[in-house]
């Protein structure tokens, strides 16, 4: 899915905050981008903007030619084609990890699928993919367990599987390595990068994570401060506004 922002500005007047300031950005279909920047730089706001969850004060937003702020039908099509991993997982307590993992596929369910899920199963067309993803991320034994009994790292991996399971055309990940140990963080990033031909934007403040991507877009105070394939020491210092930041 091709993404285009033209002069995108997002203001939160009640807080007196300009979260994004005239952002111009084009991401081609199938491209993988690390969105880098310190806390408060506008990374999460940009992801929410692409999903139609926050409205621009000015500027233009298009996702695969769709206007997230156009018709309800456009927004519905966009969200059905998108997979999202938020920094704070929104898993449903009281339900098993298995049911939480398949929830993103619910728009495709028929009556038999609903019955299958309500009795603890998985729609047949997703069962093998769920098994493969859960084994890959080391949580296959956790699937029957209610999510409130899982560790933070296990919950992160279930949220990641949920985003990957439908095979979305657009993947948005907001600090998806939070709470993961280094090997699990690398596995999570590579799983997102290996998703089937999906356009991927992953936000992070971690330079090591960002450098795993062929393109890095950095935000500082709501503006694009860097867009390219790699970072030098001067770039890092400009992004973070502090001299001597390790690159």
Sequence positions of predicted segments:
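The feature captures the beta-strand-to-loop junction immediately N-terminal to the Walker
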Residues: 36-38
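Hydrophobic anchor residue at the start of the ABC signature
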Residues: 160
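Conserved beta-strand-loop-alpha-helix hinge in the C-terminal portion
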Residues: 223-246
């Amino acid at each position: 899915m091709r993404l285009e922002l033209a002069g995108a500005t997002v203001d939160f007047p009640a807080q007196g905050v300009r979260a994004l300031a005239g952002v111009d950005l084009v991401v081609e279909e199938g491209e993988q981008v690390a969105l880098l920047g310190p806390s408060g730089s506008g990374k999460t706001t940009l992801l929410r903007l692409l999903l139609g969850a926050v409205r621009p004060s000015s500027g233009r937003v298009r996702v695969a030619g769709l206007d997230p702020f156009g018709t309800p039908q456009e927004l519905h099509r966009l969200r059905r084609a998108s997979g999202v991993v938020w920094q704070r997982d929104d898993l449903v307590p009281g339900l098993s990890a298995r049911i939480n993992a398949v929830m993103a596929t619910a728009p495709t369910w028929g009556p038999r699928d609903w019955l299958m899920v309500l009795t603890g199963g998985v729609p047949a067309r997703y069962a093998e993919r769920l098994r493969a993803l859960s084994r890959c991320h080391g949580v296959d034994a956790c699937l029957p367990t209610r999510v409130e009994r899982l560790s933070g790292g296990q919950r992160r991996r279930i949220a990641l599987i949920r985003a990957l399971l439908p095979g979305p055309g657009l993947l948005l990940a907001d600090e998806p390595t939070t709470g993961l140990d280094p090997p699990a963080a690398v596995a999570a990033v590579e799983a997102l990068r290996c998703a089937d031909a999906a356009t991927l934007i992953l936000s992070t403040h971690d330079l090591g994570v960002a450098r795993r991507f062929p393109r890095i877009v950095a935000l500082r105070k709501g503006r694009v401060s860097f867009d390219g394939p790699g970072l030098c020491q001067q770039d890092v210092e400009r992004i973070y506004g502090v001299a001597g930041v390790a690159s």
